[in-house]
Amino acid sequence: MKSISCGKEYTEDVRNINIRPEQLDDFVGQKDLIQNLKVFINAAQTRTEALDHVLLYGPPGLGKTTLAQIVSKELRVSFRATSGPLLSKAGDLAAVLTTLNAKDVLFIDEIHRLNRSIEEVLYTAMEDFCLDILVGEGPSTRTLRIDLPPFTLIGATTRLGLLSAPLRDRFGIPLHLEFYSFEELVNIIKRGARVLSAEIEEDAAREIACRARGTPRIALRLLRRIRDFVEVKDDKKITYEVADSVLLKLGVDKMGLNKLDMNYLRFLFNTSGPVGIDTISIALSEDVGNIEETVEPYLIKISFVKRTPRGRVLTDQAKEYLSFQH
């Protein structure tokens, strides 16, 4: 009986995982990138070689981790995942690399956060498939070389500019993920609703897409939260009225802007002239990295903010939008 009582919770976890596509043909958006990736994968399989190292870069929530997992499934190899902050010393990297089998995929998220000493160890591993480890201390120190099987490193970053040039140049397949179109987001939301067994009206899906900032992760997160309200109220489906009401409760306006976005815009609006990112960070009590990664990309995309050599400035379009806000 215990297994039955856990069934609903387990099914929910599986559904949330299954919202992610599992093969390239099911991946919505990034059309040119996907087509190129298919060619690279097919070529590697034809030659029975490991796929060349891949660098996925772009704003958060666009599918970098999902793509890395799909690549390993398309290649029919094992997938190992870690992140830059977790690899603090050479031994951490060696422990991961020595568990890989031939052609396996190693995914390093936030690869821009690797320290330089780890990068230097990674150079040899990526180019020559070997590790040079220092053994011993003082005069007796020697280098121990460990051979590695050919593998594929997939790095993901939201801040390409923070990668050192030597590391960036060692990726044979750099791929830039862009914001998704409105129609692509609508399709992603509909697919997510099917996986979650949630009935959704066309107008509701389109309203969520309007406020999802061109980002699938945000679209699916909003969908889940709206579904929560629908289930608690015992409604039968997600309608436009329900979606609009819940999104307003969540603090997401018609443009997909949240409280932090509005605070950012209002600060620029009330400050004369261009404003530096450090000044904005202090005024909003927000980390510079968070502002540059999660706030500014979308505001720049919708032409609300411009970056200039002297700092950030509001566009006339943003000023007009703010004038209509309460």
Curated annotation (Swiss-Prot):
One GO cellular component, as annotated: Holliday junction resolvase complex
Compartment(s) of residence: Cytoplasm
Sites where the protein binds ATP: I19, R20, G61, K64, T65, T66, E127, D128, F129, R170, Y180, R217
Region listing for Small ATPAse domain (RuvB-S), in residue ranges: 181-251
Binding of DNA, residues: R307, R312
EC number annotated for this UniProt entry: 3.6.4.-
Region (Head domain (RuvB-H)): 254-326
Location of region: Large ATPase domain (RuvB-L): 1-180
Record-level Gene Ontology MF annotations: ATP binding; ATP hydrolysis activity; four-way junction DNA binding; four-way junction helicase activity
Biological-process GO terms, alphabetical: DNA recombination; DNA repair
Group of enzyme by EC: hydrolase
Main location: cytoplasm
Catalysed reaction equations from the record: ATP + H2O = ADP + phosphate + H(+)
Subunit organization: Homohexamer. Forms an RuvA(8)-RuvB(12)-Holliday junction (HJ) complex. HJ DNA is sandwiched between 2 RuvA tetramers; dsDNA enters through RuvA and exits via RuvB. An RuvB hexamer assembles on each DNA strand where it exits the tetramer. Each RuvB hexamer is contacted by two RuvA subunits (via domain III) on 2 adjacent RuvB subunits; this complex drives branch migration. In the full resolvosome a probable DNA-RuvA(4)-RuvB(12)-RuvC(2) complex forms which resolves the HJ.
Family indicated by similarity: Belongs to the RuvB family.
Record protein name field: Holliday junction branch migration complex subunit RuvB
Gene: ruvB
